[in-house]
Amino acid sequence: ISGKPARTPT
């Protein structure tokens, strides 16, 4: 999730 949109699992 780090650095990515909160809606994505990563």
Swiss-Prot record:
- GO annotations of cellular component type: mitochondrial inner membrane
Q: Which UniProt keywords apply?
A: Membrane, Mitochondrion, Mitochondrion inner membrane
Tissue localization of expression is: Liver and heart specific isoform.
User: Where found?
Assistant: Mitochondrion inner membrane
Q: Name one GO biological process term.
A: oxidative phosphorylation
Main subcellular localisation: mitochondrion
Please report the record's description of how this protein sits within the membrane.
Answer: Single-pass membrane protein
Pathway where this protein functions: Energy metabolism; oxidative phosphorylation
* Quaternary structure and partners: Component of the cytochrome c oxidase (complex IV, CIV), a multisubunit enzyme composed of 14 subunits. The complex is composed of a catalytic core of 3 subunits MT-CO1, MT-CO2 and MT-CO3, encoded in the mitochondrial DNA, and 11 supernumerary subunits COX4I, COX5A, COX5B, COX6A, COX6B, COX6C, COX7A, COX7B, COX7C, COX8 and NDUFA4, which are encoded in the nuclear genome.
Q: What does this protein do?
A: Component of the cytochrome c oxidase, the last enzyme in the mitochondrial electron transport chain which drives oxidative phosphorylation. The respiratory chain contains 3 multisubunit complexes succinate dehydrogenase (complex II, CII), ubiquinol-cytochrome c oxidoreductase (cytochrome b-c1 complex, complex III, CIII) and cytochrome c oxidase (complex IV, CIV), that cooperate to transfer electrons derived from NADH and succinate to molecular oxygen, creating an electrochemical gradient over the inner membrane that drives transmembrane transport and the ATP synthase.
Give the record's family classification: Belongs to the cytochrome c oxidase VIII family.
Protein name as annotated:
Cytochrome c oxidase subunit 8B, mitochondrial
Organism for this UniProt entry: Oryctolagus cuniculus (Rabbit)
